[in-house]
Amino acid sequence: MYTIDNRNTTENLLQFLAASPSPFHAVEQAAKKLTEAGFLPLQECEKWDLVPGRGYFVTRNNSSIIAFAIPKKPAPSLMLTASHTDSPTYKLKDKAEMDTFGKYTRLATECYGGMLIW
């Protein structure tokens, strides 16, 4: 049975988020993690020679990344997961700086994209 080390998983996620202040950084970090896991980068405008049992990834404009693995044996189905790096997020408003009683500065933000806020 597959088990997850929650503490390690959480620490890895927090490190990834800290290293990814923008969508571009997130794509860079994802490519780094994929490379460390043995995935090979592909160029989208070149012919691909894909080998069963290998993983690959493609980036575009340093702002999007797609990763996939070719199974060693033909699979009866396809497993797919997707996400994006640009939304939801908080964006700074125009004239974002707000002085708070001379004690500290706050930044006015707005939600960009659909987000669940509890």
Residue ranges of model-derived segments:
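N-terminal hydrophobic/helix-forming segments and targeting peptides
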Residues: 1-118
